[in-house]
Amino acid sequence: MMRPSSRQPYVCWQCLSRKDSGQHIALNTRKARVASLSSLASWPISSASIAPRPTRQWDRTLRLFRERRQGLSTSTSLLGRKIPEISNEALEDFALPLEPDLQHLQDSQPKTTKRSAHLSIRQRLKQWEAENPEPFHSIPSDFALPDRPINAFTSKRSEHMLEIENIDNDNATAQVHDQDLIDTQVTPRVQAGDLVELKSEDWNIGVLAVCLGSFNGIDHFYAVTGKWFASSNFKSGFIVKNFITNSADLQPVIGALPSTVGDMSILVELQKLRAGPTREHGAGLITKMLDFQNTSRQIYQSNLERLSNPHRHLPEEEQLMTLGEIAEFLLPPKLKQSSTGFPPAALYAVYNNIRTFFDDFFHPLGQGTAGPSSIIFHVAARSDIENVARVERMVRDHYSPELLDRKSRREHDRLEPVLRQARLAIDHSRKMREWSSHGMLGPTTRVLPASTYSWSQDALTVIGVIHMWAASDVFPRSSKYQWIGAAVLRALGRYQDADVLDATVGWTFLQEIGWLMPWEIHARHSLRLPGLQVNRAGGLLPSPEEQQPAELDEDVLAPLRQDFYTSTVYCIDAPNAKEIDDGVSLEKTDKEGEYWIHVHIADPTSRIRPDSSLAKRAALMTQTSYLPGHVDKMISDEAVVAEFSLAPGRPSLTFSARLNEEGTLLDHKVTPGRIGDVVYITPQDVATAVGPVDAGIPKVSTPDVVLEVGTPPSAEDEAPTRKMTKPDELSEQNVKDLEILSRLAAAIHKVRIQKGSVPIFLPSPSADFSLVNARIEHTPSGFLACTNDPYISVKYSVSGGLHPIVDDLMGTANQIAALWCYERGIPIPFRTNLLAAQNEEALRAYTQDVIYPQLIAGKQPSLEEMRTLRNLLGGHDIAATPTFIYTMGVDIYTKATSPLRRYSDLLVHWQIQAALLEEHKRLAQGSQSLVIRKFDKYHLKPPMDDKQAARLGLPFTASHLENKVFPHLRVRERHAKTLANIDGRNELILQALVRAWRFGEGKEGQVPEKFTYTVVNVQNTCVRGRIDYFDLWAEIDLDNLAGFSLLSNMRAGDVLTVQLADVNVHMRKIVVKPVEFVQRGPERGRLFAEEQEGEGEVENGGEYIDVEHEVLQPQGR
C-alpha cells in the first residue's frame, strides 16, 4: 500500500518507517515475518498419515483470541466481523494450545513509550495498539433479517463469503407421524466423494464442493475456494454422484477436520475461525473441481447466445422440466455422450447460468437419483415474464421525476387509475374487517353489500404480478423484482401502520381487494405446480377435459376375473369417506391354522388407459389432497369414482396372502376378481366388535388441548356417504371373520416390529375446517366478497394405528404387489431406503437404543436424532430397483391399495395388468409364467431391460419411469404432502391462534398467557425452538431478546417461560418474548467434551457415527 508525501509523489509506508528510524532502505527487499512455532508444538496429529497443519492458520487463530481477551482490534481481518465466542473447555477439546495469559507480543516489547528503531510498520502499529487499547467495536452488517428482501445489487457478496444456512424448517424430518414414505427433503442424500454445489439462497452464491461424509448426523464439505463447511440441513440443487472415486483422495482433508462433533454451534464457530483443512490438504480436490469448473465455463462461453436468452428457446407455457430437458433446447447435440446424455460439466453450465441470472423464473424443485439431468425446474410462462416487465415499467413511470406535473401524469401514468380502484376496494373492506399485521384480516364485524367495482386490464396485470410476489413466492429474497410490489403498496397510501412493506402486506392487500379469501392459505399458491390452477374460492379449477364426461374403455381384464361371491368383504373406513378403494375377506384352507387373506382393491386401470385424459390429469394431481376446506380429488369425476368404489358386483384387483397364526407369509398371488357381499364398518366399531387385540402396540395418551374458533357445523352436515354397519348388526360369522383377521393382522404387526418397524405413532396436531357458516359471493369482475368466518378446530390426533386390520393388512397387500412384480422383473415405483441395507446393523442399534424408546415413552426424538436416522436410512425415495424399508419392517414395498387416490398406485396396477394379460396368454399356450427369479433382500436385482419390457407389452419401461415419470412424481408427491400435512395444516392452526389471541374469538382462556419454550438451536439472528402448545415452532428475535439475555448466552436445551409477541400466518411464523429461564441447557464446552469422550461407545451414539462412510472415518479422535 502507498501513501502520498509532500516530498515525493508516493512513498511506501514500510520504507518511510525505516527511513525515519535511520535504517538503510534496500530496493525490492522485504523483511520476512517470523512466526514462533513453539506455541503450536502440542497440536495433535489425527492420523499418522496426515502431515501437521501449517502454523500460519492457527497462529492467526491464537491472535484472534488474544485480541478478544484484551478487547483490542489488532487484525484487519476483524473489520466488520463479530468474533464468535467459544469456551475454554471447548478450545481444550479442539487441542488449541491457548494459554490464559498469552501476551507474547507485549512481553517482547519495552514497557516504556520509547519506540525501538528496528520495528517494521506492522510491528510499530501492533505496538501502538498495545499501548493505546480500545474496545473492539464491530461494524454493523447490512445483512437482511430472515424472511426480509436482500439488497443483492449494491451490496455484493463473493463466493469467498459464502455461508450455509442451517435452519431446518422441515417439520416432517423432525417428527415421526406416519408411514407414507414421502420424503419432504428437496436434496437427496449425499455420500463421500459426491460433487455438490453449496449455495446461499439469500445471496444467490454457489460454490462447488466435495462431500467428505456424514459424521454424527452432520455433513462435511470441502469447497473449491479451499474452505471447509459443515451443515446439518444441507440443500443443493446440483449433485454429481461419485465425482471422487478413490477414498485416498479424501483422506488428507478428512484427517485435517478440526472436529466431527454433532453440535452444529461448535462447528459454526470453527468455520468462522477458518479452522479446518488448508489448501495444501485439499490441493488434489481443488484441482479436480477447477478442471470441472473450467470445462463448464468453456461450454458456457461457446454457447453464450442461447444460454443468455433461455426463454426464447424454451416452450412458452409454464411447465416442469428436468435439467436434461432444458439442455436439449439450449446445448448442441454434439456435446452429448453416447449413452448418458449431456456430461455433468455441460449440465452445470446450463444450471449455473439459469440459477445465477434467471432464478426469478426457473425454480429448482429437487434432484432425483439419475444424476444432474434429473434436477427438475418449475419454468415460468413467457407471458408471466412479460407481465412483470410491463408492471415494472408502469411503476417506474409512476415514480419518474419527469412526470411530476399533473398533465403528464394523467397522460402517461397508467398506474394511478389502478391505485384509485384499489383504494376504493380497500376502504370498502375495512368497513367490514380490520386490517392486521398478522398476515390475515380480522373477522367480520359487519356485513355490507358486495362491491361492484370494475377492474381494468392494467389493474388485473398489476394484481397478477403482486400475486406472483406475495402468494406464489416467485421472486427470491435477492430478486431485483422485490421492489415492485413494495412500491405499489407505498403508492396506495393505505399501509402506513405496517413496519415493512413486504410480501405479507402484499398478501393482505390481495385479501382486502377481494382477490383472495380472508382465510386463504398461502401454501395453496406457493406450492402450486404447473398444470394445476388454484380456484381462489377454494380447491382447484377443473381442466377443460374434466368438464367433459369421462370416457371409459371396456374392461380388459374381464376374461381373467374370478368371483369372490362366497366371501364377505369388509370395507373398513371412516363414515364420510367417498372413495372406497380397499376391503378384506377371509378364506380358510385345508390346513388348520392357515388362512388366505384377500385384500380387494378397486380396479380403475382396467378401463382407464395410461395415455387417456383421465390418466394425464391424475398424473398432474398425483394424489387426492385432504387439506381441510380444500379437498381435491385425484379423479374428480364423481361418476368415475362411483363406478369403481367397492360395492357388490364391482371389479377388483385382489392381492392374496397365505398366512399362519405367527404372521408368516407362506404364499401369495394377484387375481382380477369381482366381489360379492360388502360390509361397511369403521375401525372403531371393529374394535368394539372383536374386543382388544394384542398387536404389541404401546399405549400412548393423547393431549386434550383444543383450540376452537367460529361456529361448529351441525351433525346433519356430516352425514355418512353410505350405509354403515354397527357392531350389533354384525352376524356371528362376521364377528368370527373379524376376530381371525384381527388376530392375523396383529401377528403380522409383531413380525414387522421384530424387523425394525416403528412401534407407535405419536399424536400430532390436526385441524378441522368448515365453511358452513361462511359465505363466498362472486362479483361480476371475478373477485370475491366473503362474509362471516369459517369454523376451525385444532386438536391432537393419531394418523396411524387405528386398528391392525387397516394398517397391517393393507401393508401386506402392498408388499405382495411389490414381491409379485419383482419376481417377474417388472419395473414399478418401489419405495426405497437407499442406505438401509448397508446400515442395517447400525439402524437396528440406533432405533432400538435411541429412537424407539423415546416414542414408546411418548416423546418425539430431537432434530439431531431424526437427522441421524435419516442419514442411516438414506431418506425415502422411489426407484425401479427395490430396497427393503427398515422403518416399516418389510423386505420390499410399493403402494397399490389406493388407485382412486394415488397416481403411483395406478402405475403399479397398469404394469400388473399388462403382466397378467401376457402371463394368461402364455399359460393358455402351455408356456411358463413370467417368474424369472426368487426374492433375496440382500441381493436385489434391477428390473428387465427396456426391450424385454416392450415385448411383454408393459406400458412403462424402467428407463422411462426413471427419466420421465419419477422426477415429476417425486416433486408432486412432496408438494402434496407438504401442503396437506405440514404447511397448509400449520396455516390453519395459526389462523385459529390469531383469531383467538388477537381478536378474542372462541372460549376465554383457551390460549394461555404464557408458554413453556424449549430452545432447539441458536441462529445468527434469532433463537428457534418449540412452545408447549400443539408443539409449534417459534422464535425469539433480537428485539424481543434485548434486555433479557445476550444471543451468545442462549443454549440449545434452554427452557424458558415466554409470551406471544407476534404471529404471522402468511409466513407461518410465531415470535415469542422471553419472560424467565426455567432451566438452562448443557454448556457447550461440557457437551462437546462429553461427545468427544463418548465417540466409539455404543451408549453415547459413537457406533452410529458415519456408518455409511466407515472407511473414511477419521482415526484417533
Swiss-Prot record:
For this chain, the annotated S-S bridges are none
* One GO location term (cellular component): mitochondrion
Keyword Cell inner membrane assigned to the entry: answer is no
Residues covered by region (Disordered): 705-730
Please provide the Gene Ontology terms (biological process) for this protein.
mRNA catabolic process; mRNA processing
PROSITE patterns membership: RIBONUCLEASE_II
Q: List, for all copies, the residue spans of the domain called RNB.
A: 561-916
Localization (cell): Mitochondrion
Q: What family, per the record? A: Belongs to the RNR ribonuclease family.
Protein name, per record = Mitochondrial protein cyt-4
